[in-house]
Amino acid sequence: MSSTIFETSREIVSIEKVDEIPRSKSIHVFAICITSDNKPIIAARRTSFVFQEIMSQRKSPTSTLKVSKNLLRYMYNNEIKEISRRLKKGIILINNINSSFEELILLGGKINKSESVNECLQREIQEESDYHLTVKCFGQELIKISIYDKLFEKKYISYCKICHINETLSTILSFKLYNVEIRELKSLIDCSNNDKYKYLFFIYNTLINSK
């Protein structure tokens, strides 16, 4: 099947419809969640992928860091402060950084060996929402998402489907989350200024309109 390509300042994303998800190691599945009043829901990650990658490259917990200025625009302010504290030399002026950054993701994760796709999604959606979201049903259509991370030259492949949930948008936006991964649930429609918005909306629109 043909694929649609999106390119942002940090990613090249290929999206295509598929008929099934292969069963192999390290398969990741995600969902565009649809509220009972038909609004698409995504999540804001508590930690940016850039900060996570930088910290994973440390030789020790107390290592000093050398960080490209280009990476700072893809981190939260508290992470930039932590990076600044560990720099080999100099400091980072937070006032010069775009404070509106937000790391958007879809709910989901890695399939455990004994799980089906839907079982994995149900578990991940419950865990990442602090058990506030309850699943009504899953859609049948599938999309394969291939992402090339231009910042760190890494490639990721995942799969996505629709998940209908029982809660309304207003109820979901009132939730306070305390888990380690997700800081907030959000309406996708409200995130049009985010660098991932165009391809996330394309995924949503493709899945919701598939026959």
Q: What residues fall within each predicted segment?
A:
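Short, basic/aromatic recognition patches
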Residues: I12-I21
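Compositionally biased low-complexity segments enriched in polar/charged residues
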Residues: S2, I21-P22, S192
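Extended charged low-complexity segments that act as oligomerization/scaffolding linkers
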Residues: I147-D149
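Short beta-strand scaffold segments in enzyme catalytic cores
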Residues: H28-T35
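A short catalytic or substrate-binding loop motif that flags glycine-/basic-rich loops and adjacent residues
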Residues: I21-I27, E153-K155
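Conserved Nudix-box catalytic region and its N-terminal flanking loop in Nudix hydrolases
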Residues: K39-E127, Y131-H132
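A short coil-to-beta-strand element that immediately follows conserved catalytic motifs
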Residues: H132-I143
